[in-house]
């Protein structure tokens, strides 16, 4: 278990490196308007978005966990977050969310 600061730093580094590798131009939306690339991968990255947006997206299909998520105190200032969707695997749609969110939940 790491501190939430360390986890945010790791998430930021992951988002930045994936952004540099896969995205050639800025993306304006977190979950929409993805750019499709020749590799068959779509990627979306969001920088500096509010806590409510994070909560809404994380709880879109899991309404029962909304109170638990609110208790985490996710940062409202700057938070780097990345979702990579592999077109060949529907199961990987929320992989990025689950990985980052799992570490953030366990951080004390």
Swiss-Prot record:
Q: Which domain of life is it from?
A: Eukaryota
The record describes its membrane topology as: Single-pass membrane protein
One GO term describing the cellular component: membrane
Where is the protein situated, by its record's location annotation? Answer: Membrane
Keywords of the record, alphabetical order, are: Membrane, Transmembrane, Transmembrane helix
Q: Which residues cross the membrane?
A: 72-94
Q: What is this protein called?
A: Uncharacterized protein YLR296W
